[in-house]
């Protein structure tokens, strides 16, 4: 509940003076006049000292501690005395954090390690205003450093006149101690709601990524003054912080960030270096022995285990300062953010919290019986609210009708402002609603207002990092029948944290189309349905038993996934999964999948892989550990007919040497590769593709290609490749990784590896296809492609025309490119269209005509409905559409227009 608790007896000041610390203690002396006196935890350090801090370099009239007199007695009646236990958690066994005691009720959001967690929402609210430290949410990027009070130092350097290396005793006893109540909030609080709309790059925070404590430490301002911080005129413009943990970001770094000097020196902001939380030394997860506290800001600015404070001219150049805690525009995805350097634009950095509120009562799945007793009384809805920058929450409203009308809530604000009028803590709200009114409601929503009249938006605003989500918090109200003869109202929160199931957004996601679920917002197919795998563990031998289409398991980064249900839906066809079923394919999965695809994988996680010893690694499992007897045979790939087949095992990489390279244009190359044996054929069925594999800059890179050579060519195969060079396209300044690598290969001395066959489509001849394992016949083919997407079409065209006159399939090709110079295989296509006018018709579409004097007679612009109606047949039972091109072309130019032409997009449309 969020109601104030019964007052408890005060913990009166001891009669004797504080004693010096005993050897081996943490160095914190006790004090009696703590502002949280009576709150149920021990009092703290000796009273704040008055007077100057040291030789001061600027006026400091506001240094005294009088501002806290207003709230010293305020919190005792709001603290629950129940102890939240901490113990060694079995989930930490085998990790670098196995030495840390933690509260077992914390909900883990990122697996076993590192710890990222939030408390159960009901348990958090049960404790009211002050959150017990063991229950406080945790955001860790890596293993927790082992801090030692006696040896820990904080270096203060940079643009200061007196650089110093301060010990913990000096911080605790050499500066006036400030005690600040502050609510900490992760910028990702409520992120799972965003992940239900479109997967962000972040994990699933629920609505309990928020906690409140009373923090004690030295004021940052005092420390900087002691060290002689230079003025703005001396170019001292920023204060940078660096922690102690070793993290992988940026190739290896500490966690670091910065704030402006103006903020750091502002006494009204109460910025401190805390070494105590709720009257006790910091817990390891919260930064022991010392951290940074910036009230009113996101938690990501408050560096834990702080080691260095550097006064600089420029803001921090730390990897995590730029690649974390940003709100980028909704159209920016991970690829665009990296390609166009959105991370470094200062306008998108997050500092202060925004206004937010959450309904905590009723809880998720709580049932309110509807009977003669309950309908005669009101039901109390409760929750919390907060804002940033020291702004007070002044209003909270609840609506039962989607915002048509609002009810004003009663506010419970235990906090008193500091002497500058700033509020750093959450508040609680409640409103009584007649049960009969709830019975007629579909949902309940809440919004809060702060003193600047900022409020929350109605609709969710998606962003790549999933941060600062503060749309109206809505719970659904549904009628249920919990017992015979009785009805009730069941309340449904939008999500449940981490991988927990439940929530109306997750349910809605299964029921609605992407457009209905997120109007006006591009929805990604990578959005994961939350898995419920828990911590079930499997050995590699168990995984190897699941290598068939009946049961296809894979291992990626130590997680085990059952992809059987996804075989029919995989964009690359079932073969793309079956080729690695029953094995660890971490390296290959990372080599070919985007971040969105990696997020989708979470849907199918069933547990964790048990590793035994240090000899296990993914390479061994991928290439040597699995038996093909568990792999469903891929059609034609394992059949030996006439010449031996190079692609005899879809799991094995086949080394192929480059024997010829032709430069067809400034960016188009025809590569010819020799098979391992001169009497082999590649063994690739028409419609399938191969993976080209290469190690580039120490990492495996894999890309799909369709050979343009005849399927029965002996001893070699050819790849037609458009090379995407560096610095040619502003959105992709680095160019194509694989195509530039292929361009660098030397004839005669360079090799690549290939794997296959892969793909969900196979043309078996004379109008017959096998699509996702099912037979399909077509008399007419509508082929629409762009750029290098011509290669799978070319393969089918080649097969049809080689089987003349028996194969009577009609092919209608619409081929789009940027200019006439970019059309691949044009000579062959034009020749075939002339030689076989009843079988093949070709129409070109280009963005721009480079040589109008040549008399371009085809279309200019985009692929439109009019072009398709004029040059491909209308949909029907005997017509099949084949498409291959950039995703926007498929989504906006091809699919909607074919649908208008009566194509059955579920059964008569294939995208390679």
UniProtKB/Swiss-Prot annotation:
Binds 1 FAD per subunit. Residues 13-23 have a biased composition (Low complexity). FAD binds at residues 703-706, 720-725, 732, 737-739, 788, 791. Residues 85-94 have a biased composition (Basic and acidic residues). Its EC number is 1.7.1.1. Heme binds at residues 570, 593. Residues 54-68 have a biased composition (Acidic residues). GO terms for molecular function: FAD binding; heme binding; molybdenum ion binding; molybdopterin cofactor binding; nitrate reductase (NADH) activity; nitrate reductase (NADPH) activity; sulfite oxidase activity. GO terms for cellular component: organelle membrane. Mo-molybdopterin binds at residue 186. The keyword Iron applies. Residues 1-99 are annotated as: Disordered. Residues 651-764 form the FAD-binding FR-type domain. Keywords: Disulfide bond, FAD, Flavoprotein, Heme, Iron, Metal-binding, Molybdenum, NAD, Nitrate assimilation, Oxidoreductase. Belongs to the nitrate reductase family. Homodimer. Nitrate reductase is a key enzyme involved in the first step of nitrate assimilation in plants, fungi and bacteria. This is Nitrate reductase [NADH]. It comes from Hordeum vulgare (Barley). The lineage of its organism: Eukaryota, Viridiplantae, Streptophyta, Embryophyta, Tracheophyta.
